[in-house]
């Protein structure tokens, strides 16, 4: 059985990047929550 994590910088950015988060209402809520927590990195 192959490993489930097959790293790809492009896929990582597209799925979890800042612009991907900003594109949806839910993603914006994610960023808002992380800002409220004081996270250093908001997204991938």
Swiss-Prot record:
Gene Ontology cellular-component annotations: ribonucleoprotein complex; ribosome
GO terms under biological process: translation
Transmembrane segments: none
Keyword vocabulary terms for this entry: Ribonucleoprotein, Ribosomal protein
InterPro entries (UniProt xref): Ribosomal_bL34 (IPR000271), Ribosomal_bL34_CS (IPR020939)
Pfam families, per database record: Ribosomal_L34
Gene Ontology MF terms: structural constituent of ribosome
Protein name as annotated: Large ribosomal subunit protein bL34
């Amino acid at each position: 059985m192959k490993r489930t994590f097959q790293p790809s910088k492009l896929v990582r950015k597209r799925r979890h990047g800042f612009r991907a988060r900003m594109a949806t209402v839910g993603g914006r809520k994610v960023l808002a929550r992380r800002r409220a927590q004081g996270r250093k990195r908001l997204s991938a």
